[in-house]
């Protein structure tokens, strides 16, 4: 080093300047090297305790941390409210869109239902994409509706044959109370012709039995009267009486019972 031409030669000045520059760059800041200057204090001034001097620093450090935590919580709550409002708005928009789509589908279906039907309803469905039936099918597929269930709601259900059968006429013999109406509703349906036939047979049988039994009773009573005591006019009066008794009286037509 002592005989180095860089330090003792003609280039020694340049190398010295380079060393000084390097020392200036790598030198620590003056705040680290400077010693703290103590302020002059009087003898009567008491030095503050270490606890009091350290407490404000901790307080100054804790206060910003608490404020930052509160700000983060407020920001999280605001973000949660914003997300909830956005979710509700999206759900409301989806429900409104689905309702509008169903309304459009029903309106189109009613329009197609009320339109005059052609002889061949399947004609032109495949060729014409703008046909009402094709549009209706696309709308149903888009709305994810069941065409069979929708048609069942629009088409009236067939009336059963029992409801189309004519009911027998109801004969009202007088005012009937609610008990009679309830009893009449509970009775099973019976053919009225069969009822009329049975009632006619019963009435005809009772009338024949009464008509046959009455002349026999009258004949026995007349014979008894003739045998016991004869009238003063003789046998001719008795014969006339028997003849008069044997002639049947005109029968009163029996009342016809009508089905309820």
Curated annotation (Swiss-Prot):
Signal peptide coordinates: 1-33
Pfam families tied to this protein: ProSAAS
Keyword Signal: yes
Gene that encodes the chain: PCSK1N
Gene Ontology terms: cellular component: extracellular space; secretory granule; trans-Golgi network
Subunit record text: Interacts via the C-terminal inhibitory domain with PCSK1 66 kDa form.
Motif (Sufficient for inhibition of PCSK1): 239-244
Expression sites (tissue/organ): Expressed in brain and pancreas.
GO molecular function: endopeptidase inhibitor activity; serine-type endopeptidase inhibitor activity; signaling receptor binding
Post-translational modification: Proteolytically cleaved in the Golgi. O-glycosylated with a core 1 or possibly core 8 glycan.
Residues glycosylated per entry: 53, 228, 247
Keyword Glycoprotein: yes
Phenotype when changing residue 245 to A: Reduces inhibition of PCSK1
Chain residue ranges for the region called C-terminal inhibitory domain: 221-260
Protein function: May function in the control of the neuroendocrine secretory pathway. Proposed be a specific endogenous inhibitor of PCSK1. ProSAAS and Big PEN-LEN, both containing the C-terminal inhibitory domain, but not the further processed peptides reduce PCSK1 activity in the endoplasmic reticulum and Golgi. It reduces the activity of the 84 kDa form but not the autocatalytically derived 66 kDa form of PCSK1. Subsequent processing of proSAAS may eliminate the inhibition. Slows down convertase-mediated processing of proopiomelanocortin and proenkephalin.
Compartmental location: Secreted; Golgi apparatus, trans-Golgi network
Location of region: Disordered: 165-188
Effect of residue 246 to A: Reduces inhibition of PCSK1
Protein name: ProSAAS
Keywords: Cleavage on pair of basic residues, Glycoprotein, Golgi apparatus, Neuropeptide, Secreted, Signal
Domain observations: ProSAAS(1-180) increases secretion of enzymatically inactive PCSK1.
Organism: Homo sapiens
Major localization listed first in the record, in broad terms: secreted
Compositionally biased tracts (Acidic residues): 179-188
Region of interest: ProSAAS(1-180): 34-215
One GO term of the biological process aspect: neuropeptide signaling pathway
